[in-house]
Amino acid sequence: SLWEFGQMILKETGKLPFPYYGAYGCYCGWGGRRGPKDATDRCCYVHDCKQICECDKAAAVCFRERKYMAYLRVLCKK
């Protein structure tokens, strides 16, 4: 579930999922489009698996292993 995915992200990164990753880059969160803007955004792009447990875990680990750069969706061009 989305809640469980959020718990995985919190456990792996120590960051709250929605404020940190819900609108990160051009691909994380709802309605991801275009290509990823950095390594963290690429985690969302590669692991866009719609709540499949193993894939969600891989995404959470991917977030942990990448530097968080605060690349907000508002910076993406249409």
From Swiss-Prot:
Keyword Calcium set for record: yes
Entry-linked Pfam families: Phospholip_A2_1
Active site, UniProt feature: 47, 56
GO molecular function terms noted in the UniProt entry: calcium ion binding; calcium-dependent phospholipase A2 activity; phospholipid binding; toxin activity
Record GO biological process: arachidonate secretion; defense response to bacterium; lipid catabolic process; negative regulation of T cell proliferation; phospholipid metabolic process
The protein's Enzyme Commission number: 3.1.1.4
Localisation per UniProt entry: Secreted
Obligatory cofactor(s): Ca(2+)
Co-factor binding details: Binds 1 Ca(2+) ion.
Residues that bind Ca(2+): 27, 29, 31, 48
Enzymatic reactions: a 1,2-diacyl-sn-glycero-3-phosphocholine + H2O = a 1-acyl-sn-glycero-3-phosphocholine + a fatty acid + H(+)
Alphabetical keyword list: Antibiotic, Antimicrobial, Blood coagulation cascade inhibiting toxin, Calcium, Disulfide bond, Hemostasis impairing toxin, Hydrolase, Lipid degradation, Lipid metabolism, Metal-binding, Myotoxin, Secreted, Toxin
Tissue: Expressed by the venom gland.
Database matches in PANTHER family: PHOSPHOLIPASE A2 FAMILY MEMBER, PHOSPHOLIPASE A2, MEMBRANE ASSOCIATED
Function: Snake venom phospholipase A2 (PLA2) that exhibits myotoxin and anticoagulant activity. Displays edema-inducing activities in mouse paw. Also displays cytotoxic activity against some cell lines and myotubes, and antimicrobial activities against E.coli, C.albicans and Leishmania. PLA2 catalyzes the calcium-dependent hydrolysis of the 2-acyl groups in 3-sn-phosphoglycerides.
Sequence similarity: Belongs to the phospholipase A2 family. Group II subfamily. D49 sub-subfamily.
Identification of the protein by name: Basic phospholipase A2 myotoxin-I
